[in-house]
Curated annotation (Swiss-Prot):
Family matches, as HAMAP family: RuvC (MF_00034)
InterPro entries reported in the protein's UniProt record: RNaseH-like_sf, RNaseH_sf, X-over_junc_endoDNase_Mg_BS, X-over_junc_endoDNase_RuvC
UniProt superkingdom: Bacteria
Gene: ruvC
Positions of Mg(2+) 2 binding: E67
GO CC terms, sorted: cytoplasm; Holliday junction resolvase complex
GO MF annotations, alphabetized: crossover junction DNA endonuclease activity; DNA binding; magnesium ion binding
Similarity field: Belongs to the RuvC family.
Name the UniProt record assigns to this protein: Crossover junction endodeoxyribonuclease RuvC
EC number, UniProt record: 3.1.21.10
């Protein structure tokens, strides 16, 4: 199974493909899509979409994971980031890939064990997990690989049970609740 992780951005979008089959994570491909230096935001969105469609067609991933935008102080920046995420998701959806979303804290915790890890710590763990110490990844690329690994970790530990809240857990597991 190949997982495509994407770290969307309005200036650069990182992507990373990993294959977690067999318990060892293998690096398939990774890079950063540098977007044209233009003020025309729709053109950048098309570049993200087109580049990711090319990556999907070239590598045939089975699943797609993307980082959710974090809340910031600048509403315009948040809108641009959300649109970049949407362009990435549309590339996956138009190729019939299932889409998963993760917060930055979820990704960091999954890869480093610390939801507040620095970019340097994330990069170190990516190189270690993927046995890629001879490679240095740009931050956007390392983040995308971390997103793919996070998704792989989630799949590996998914027991099939999903709950929408405490009430649904109690309904599904009455024997595990004591009064």
């Amino acid at each position: 199974m190949i997982i495509l992780g994407v770290d969307p951005g309005s200036r650069a979008t990182g992507y990373g493909l990993v294959d977690p089959s067999g318990g060892d994570e293998h690096l398939v491909a990774a890079d950063t899509i540098r977007l044209a230096d233009t003020d025309d935001h729709p053109t950048r969105l098309k570049q993200i979409y087109d580049a990711l469609v090319d990556v999907i067609d070239a590598h045939g991933p089975d699943e797609f994971a993307v980082e959710m935008p974090v809340y910031g102080q600048n509403p315009q920046s948040m809108l641009k980031l959300g649109r970049a995420q949407a362009a990435a998701m549309m590339a996956a959806l138009n190729r019939d890939l299932p889409v998963a979303q993760y917060t930055p804290k979820e990704v960091k915790k999954s890869v480093t064990g610390n939801g507040n890890a620095s970019k340097k710590q994330v990069g170190f763990m990516i190189e270690s997990i993927l046995s890629a110490r001879e490679q240095t990844f740009a931050h956007d690329t390392a983040d995308a690989l971390a997103i793919a690994l996070c998704h792989g970790n989630r799949d590996a530990h998914d027991d099939g049970d999903s709950y929408t809240g405490w009430a649904s857990f109690v309904d599904a597991n009455p024997d595990r609740v004591s009064e």
